[in-house]
Amino acid sequence: MEEKYSSNVMSSGRLGPVDAPESRLTRYIVLLCFTKFLKALGIFESYDLLKVVHIVQFIFILKLGSTCFMVLFQKPFSSGKSITKRQWVSIVKHAFVSCIISLLWFFGLTLCGPLRTLLLFEHSDIVVISLLTVLFTGSGGGPSKTRGAAFFIIAVICLLLFDNDDLMAKIAEHPEGHHDSALTHFLYRAFFLLGVADHKGGVLLLVLALCFNVGFHTASRKLSLDIGGAKRLQALSHLVSVIILSPWVIILSATTESKIESWSALIMPFMTVIFSVMIMDFYVESVCSVKMEPSKCARYGSFLIFASALLLGNFWTHPITDQLRAMNKPAHQLHTEHVLSGGVVVSAIFFILSAQILASSSRKGQRGTLVGYSPEGTPLYNFMGDALHNTSPSMPRFLKDSLKQILEEYDSRQIFYFLCLNLAFTFVEIFYGVWTNSLGLLSDGFHMLFDCSALVMGLIAALMTRWKATRIFSYGYGRVEILSGFINGLFLVVIAFFVFIEAVARIYDPPDINTDMLTPVSVGGLIVNLVGICAFSHAHSHGAARGGCPSHDHGHSHHGHGHSHGHNHGHSHSDHGHNHGHTHNHGHSHGSAGVGMNANMRGVFSHVLADTLGSVGVIVSTILIRQFGWLIADPLCSLFIAVLIFGSVLPLLKDACQVILLRIPQETEKGINIALEKISNLDGLISYRDPHFWRHSASLVAGTIHVQVMSDVVEQRIIQQVTSLLKDAGVNNLTVQVEKEAYFQHMSGLSTGFQDVLIMTKQMDTIKYYKDGTYIM
């Protein structure tokens, strides 16, 4: 039997079509790689051609060249069934929409350049459909697809905000009041009314064209089936497009002055673009989609064309490429037009990652849970649980639910409101800095934006602490707030250290400081931070013990079992020992256990306090510099602030480290010791061993203890007494294990190792005698 029909298909964890061997796909991958590189080269050449050829004439020539080739080789009129009148109407509509999308595509190319056009427009339909599915439906495909959608959005944002594309070249290319045609004038006017720059408008235009193109391809599938195939439809559509564009091209040729000195010099560039962009890419991608999985073809194709775009973007403006191009260009444009920037490189990385994730196949083999066997002995599996577990909500629904949870709880609500206030002030400061060209305002604005990361971390931690416990995280996520506070504390220590080092260096050589905008910025920041001080002061004063913000981290008890089988072993996991099989305690403890340490809120408060001290220091140093010219005041204030920040964050780090290291809570340590003394005096209890107590979160103190009791003692009564004593001491999640002599004898019989038998024997000896030496029968 062949391998693809063997039992390994079942054991591989996936049912369905068997993939072709990688050796057979290598030729198609190499062909796809070569084709995508040629297409990227053709797009770069198209950008050069569009500088001298009108966009409508350019599209007309591309459609005409591809029509001649496809009509000659496809023979759409002689092959296949005859086309009806209704189908011809659909073909005309198809051609018209294709012309519109081509206009948007190539106009975006003139605005953004070839590299950015390839990054934005050359995405497979699978990638875009997966992206839209994640954003607007509830069946997004899991966390990986959501992560891919987030990467795609981040990539577009990087192009919009962090890609400093050429400004002077754009001004020289289309000065105000002059445009090549009514079409370009209309689009430039639209960008002006929207208030966006041409580069950013080109990015948005290409994203819009990409969505239109995917919808256009999806709607064309039924028509291609009716016509007789996608290749026949493409040939007829290009032919009709040439007919539609012909009157427009004739009018443009008669009414506008041409920039082209000799059309013969453009024959080879146009042939290159027609062959690489319009013909070869269409045919090769059609073949590869059939021979390979569409998702695999999309992943390889996206990576190859993006990598080719980065490679050509780095070398296309190099003087060596003058030998590769057929057109003459001014020398000063070789290094100014759409060059590589940090923003576009980061964007390309995120586009590659998003394409790999979104194009991955969501068809996975389900791993079922063994639930038993049939009467014939066949194993039975349950797949429904995993299927339900792997479903995830869409991004808008997830954000809506998260916002609802944030606003329900006091601490997260306070962090969210202050984060919004801080972000508003930050963006106002950045906007005013850009408007006034103030580097000081811009640097302080981005500094505050960086500080908002601490608030975001605190907000996420406050939200995660309310997540329900899972099979993997059985204690829940309450300790996330401890981790958040610890990270914020370490972050502040690093800041204080670098501020201290810089302040010491500036004491010996105080620099000149421009104080023009320092005072209003510092006063505004001080007002914002004082609001945060008032909002988070309760976190610094008494942690999580606040009547207005009760903790939602309930102390769930585990199951309490009192066994009195042949070996008389009592074993219980209980929160308070009721005399029945299973007990659960969901009540809040308002005793000493409720006074927990909310390290997350303390970390947020420490960050706000550090910013407040910074604003005060800037105000004081500004006054001293203006009034007395004391330049040394700035490093002295910074030195003082660094010491204060370090001193204020040390208690937070100390408490967080104690919780992480599972120390007995200080506020319950004395009560636990008293409770242990009372436990040792209980009737019927001989001794106890292995007492472990630790703080899990702000409202949960957990513990375990083993108690040795006499043979005639009722286990549940001992469990109830021990649990009650430790609960009063502040332990609200307790596990009690009751041990009798028969249990040790049973374990000694089962043990085969010498050390195990020795330990059990010693434990039996401690059980047989009271503290006064009386022997127990």
Swiss-Prot record:
SUPFAM superfamilies, sorted:
Cation efflux protein transmembrane domain-like (SSF161111)
Q: Which GO terms describe its biological process?
A: GPI anchor biosynthetic process; intracellular zinc ion homeostasis; zinc ion import into Golgi lumen; zinc ion import into organelle
**GO molecular function terms attached to this record:** metal ion binding; zinc:proton antiporter activity
Alphabetized Gene3D superfamilies for the sequence: Cation efflux protein transmembrane domain (1.20.1510.10)
Region: His-rich loop, residue numbers: 538-586
Top-level taxon in the UniProt lineage: Eukaryota
Keywords noted in UniProt: Antiport, Cytoplasmic vesicle, Golgi apparatus, Ion transport, Membrane, Metal-binding, Transmembrane, Transmembrane helix, Transport, Zinc, Zinc transport
Ranges for the region named Disordered are 547-593
Q: Where would you find this protein in the cell?
A: Golgi apparatus, Golgi stack membrane; Cytoplasmic vesicle, COPII-coated vesicle membrane; Cytoplasmic vesicle, Secretory vesicle membrane; Golgi apparatus, trans-Golgi network membrane
> Could you tell me what reaction this enzyme catalyses?
Zn(2+)(in) + 2 H(+)(out) = Zn(2+)(out) + 2 H(+)(in)
Q: Does the keyword Cell membrane apply?
A: no
Ranges facing Lumenal side: 50-52, 116-117, 170-189, 256-263, 321-338, 436-444, 506-516, 626-629
Q: Which residues bind Zn(2+)?
A: 447, 451, 607, 611
Mark out the compositionally biased spans (Basic residues). Answer: 555-571, 579-589
Name the GO cellular-component terms: endoplasmic reticulum membrane; ER to Golgi transport vesicle membrane; Golgi apparatus; Golgi cis cisterna membrane; Golgi membrane; secretory granule membrane; trans-Golgi network membrane
Give ranges for the Cytoplasmic compartment. 1-28, 74-94, 139-148, 211-234, 285-299, 360-414, 466-484, 538-604, 651-777
What Pfam families does this protein map onto?
A: Cation_efflux (PF01545)
Q: Which NCBIfam families match?
A: CDF
**What does this chain do?**
Together with SLC30A6 forms a functional proton-coupled zinc ion antiporter mediating zinc entry into the lumen of organelles along the secretory pathway. By contributing to zinc ion homeostasis within the early secretory pathway, regulates the activation and folding of enzymes like alkaline phosphatases and enzymes involved in phosphatidylinositol glycan anchor biosynthesis.
Q: Which family does it belong to?
A: Belongs to the cation diffusion facilitator (CDF) transporter (TC 2.A.4) family. SLC30A subfamily.
- List the PANTHER family: PROTON-COUPLED ZINC ANTIPORTER SLC30A5, PTHR45755
Q: What is this protein called?
A: Proton-coupled zinc antiporter SLC30A5
Which gene does this sequence derive from? slc30a5
